Amino acid sequence: MSFINERVQPEGLTFDDVLLIPAYSEVLPREVNVQTRFSRNISLNIPIVSAAMDTVTEAPLAIALAREGGIGVIHKNMTIAEQAAQVRKVKRAENGMIYDPVTISKDHTVGDALNLMKENKIGGIPVVDADRMLIGIVTNRDLRFQRDMSRRIEEVMTPGDRLVTTHNPELSHAQEILLNSKIEKLPVVDDAGRLVGLITYKDITKVQDHPNACKDAKGRLRVAAGVGVTPDAMDRVKALVAEDVDAVVLDSAHGHSANIVSMLKRIKEVYPSLDVVVGNIATGGAARYLIENGADGVKVGIGPGSICTTRIIAGVGVPQLTAIYDVACVARESGVPVIADGGLRYSGDLVKALAAGGDCVMIGWMFAGREEAPGGTIIFNGRKFKSYRGMGSIDAMKAGSADRYFQKGCEGNISKLVPEGIAARVPFKGSLSETVYQLIGGVRSGMGYCGAKDIETLKQARFIRITASGMQESHPHDVAITSEAPNYSSER
């Protein structure tokens, strides 16, 4: 019996081991379709997802990414209430119509209204009675010069008989009314005069500014949130569902495990219509196990991340390109999307991940340095940086991610934690939209070279194995770079 023949797979490949072979093309990069899916029931306009990491995704980045056409996954290193509030911020950031606007009663005070406006970052509040009958609206203009904070809202609001309202929530109709009436907020009421929603000119402008945004059926930005296998997991899911989260990501370092599937079944039993993405895995067998037990999406990647040390500390993992392919071969049988998580350094790696079978990619470090990512900037050697840490780092596990690495209960004693990640810094790189533009530009270019009109066609592209010399030849060489491009850095 040979150890090599019996127990060692022939080889595992990652992004730098291959290139895509160019093919005959009838499409230009600007003509290709980059729409895809995140889960069974959630479509994306670009194949990009942000990682559920505490130095990557909170509401600001999730909002920015959804406006570009992707989706963000809010991390869970916070209380249930805090995570639910992050989801709420995303869902309220942009609306065709606000279906559950913040309201106030006529007996509240000017001070109450100002506090509500400040807390929710809004400029107007419908005034309703106990039956939600619209009786007026109060805006920041009504309150701007009020000195008496105890004055009742009824005395300063614009009363219902002077309000312009509508029964038709169509945005084109609402825009016409807003323009003709020279107002900024349009209450939507039913036949009885009961408040149904609120349309603002600001929201209509956002719709026009971000035509590619990833939105739900009500015109709100989509967002997902991470959950783990913890005693309060179902309470967390309940709070997230109450805020209309679009999907939850059941996150673990080893998704091919009994406790993950047990939690998956519990979530699907209570919330059968909620999409649950599960990870991380690295084999086709793991994909089959999760899909058979109800997973609506599977996330691939054990150890490829720049801040992950799992492969070194635990000696476990599969090179990312091979892992994506093996999982995709199984997932395509049931139509479950595959998310390629980790190991990406350049836009060309995104193209390779999609061609190997991924439906979308999850990005961490490339987004951690953006202004929308959590945390402020630091100055080091005269340059701006932002912090970036693996969820398996000691700091992240102390903050709440220990369960992801099956070490729940050890957070209070650092010496008992066995980290599988590090903390680092990444260069500050400006806004997210600039990065996404370059990444999607690279994806479009790669699809054009392969003659792929859409991502499904790209999955038929052929690869060629290359040597280290071939990769060296692929990078700029034999010159000193004097002006770096926005999508390439030799420091990566």
Predicted regions and their residues:
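Catalytic cores of alpha/beta
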Residues: 60-63, 234-243, 282-300, 340, ...
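Alpha/beta catalytic cores of nucleotide-metabolism and tRNA/nucleoside-modifying enzymes
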Residues: 1-24, 104-105, 176, 226, ...
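Active-site-adjacent beta->alpha loops and helix N-cap segments on the catalytic face
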Residues: 30, 79-88, 146-150, 194-214, ...
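Catalytic beta/alpha-barrel core
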Residues: 73-77, 103-104, 124-126, 164-166, ...
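Terminal amphipathic helices with adjacent charged low-complexity linkers/tails
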Residues: 76-91, 127, 131-147, 188-205, ...
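Bateman/CBS regulatory modules and CBS-like beta-alpha motifs in cytosolic regions of diverse proteins
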Residues: 28-44, 51-53, 82-122, 127-129, ...
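Short beta-strand/loop segments at the ligand-binding rim of alpha/beta enzyme cores
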Residues: 43-50, 97-101, 216-226, 267-282, ...
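Glycine-rich phosphate-binding active-site loops on the catalytic face of alpha/beta enzymes
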Residues: 67-82, 191, 245-257, 296-314, ...
